[in-house]
Amino acid sequence: MTNTGNTPQKPKQKSFASNVLLILIAQVAVKVLGMLYRMVITNIDGFGDAGNGFYSAGYQVYILLLAISSVGIPNAIAKLISEKTALSDYGGARKIFRTALCIFAGIGTVLSAALFLLADPIAHYVLHLDGAGYTLAALAPSIFFVCISSVFRGYFSGTNQMKVMSASQVIEQAFKSTLTIVFVLAAVGMAPEIMSAYANSATTVATICGALYLTFAYLRRKKNFPAAQKAGIKKDFFPTAKKILALAVPISLCSVISAINRMVDTATITRGIE
């Protein structure tokens, strides 16, 4: 007789291995594309070290706000949704997704508006680099779209749809790499701080493209996912929000501390050069 005791585990093991491979490929592709476009724009006439300085300084503030708003979202949502789907509680899974979307859309809106309105004061008083205000203003809208994308990525991860999540990362980075080079070339002849703002506006456009891809992917697959019960969604909003934040905040704190350290280093170096 053939021993079939381990047979049911094989599809799961194969699926897990495929998911890990997809994530690894996506991460490698993102890193390579990111490295290539930074090398290219640094060597574009007029950008150089000055433009790179504005680009990097503004990006540190952006990374800090992303750490506050979105770093812990995918893992927290994926964990909660996977727990619900494992119990076939699809209504509960949809409820978590909707609650998370409301929370982080709100957080993203507030932080995007704050960064846009306070771009110049942050550049002057925090970074000690006045020209970086253009970069911060260009990056501001992307925080909202990153928050939205993070919720969708958590949903797809929790429902074991890793192809969508990995594809979205590669698509976003491909747009960012290509558009950054195109936008910087379009700004040749302008001041380095303006060229830097053009470069970072490509990040905003890329995050919009990534969010749109994830939204369409969700809508296309939504019909295959059992609908949530309407009753109780509003009543359970705050308990569900508390669960999401309890998981997301501790993960975000580590990234926040790291981002603050990098921002302090950047400000210290800038002040030393002055």
Where are these predicted regions, by residue range?
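Membrane-interface junctions at transmembrane-helix termini in multi-pass inner-membrane proteins
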Residues: 145-168
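Small-residue-rich midsections of specific transmembrane alpha-helices
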Residues: 56-80, 141-144
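Membrane-interface helix-loop junctions in multi-pass transport and translocation proteins
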Residues: 160-164, 174-217
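Alpha-helical transmembrane segments of multi-pass membrane proteins
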Residues: 128-152
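N-terminal membrane topogenesis motif
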Residues: 1-36, 91, 95, 232-254
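Interfacial/gating helices of multi-pass transporter permease domains
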Residues: 42-64, 192, 196-200, 242-247, ...
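Helix-terminus/linker motif at the lipid-water interface of multi-pass membrane proteins
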Residues: 35-52, 123-125, 187, 192, ...
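Short membrane-interface helical motifs at transmembrane helix boundaries
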Residues: 110-133
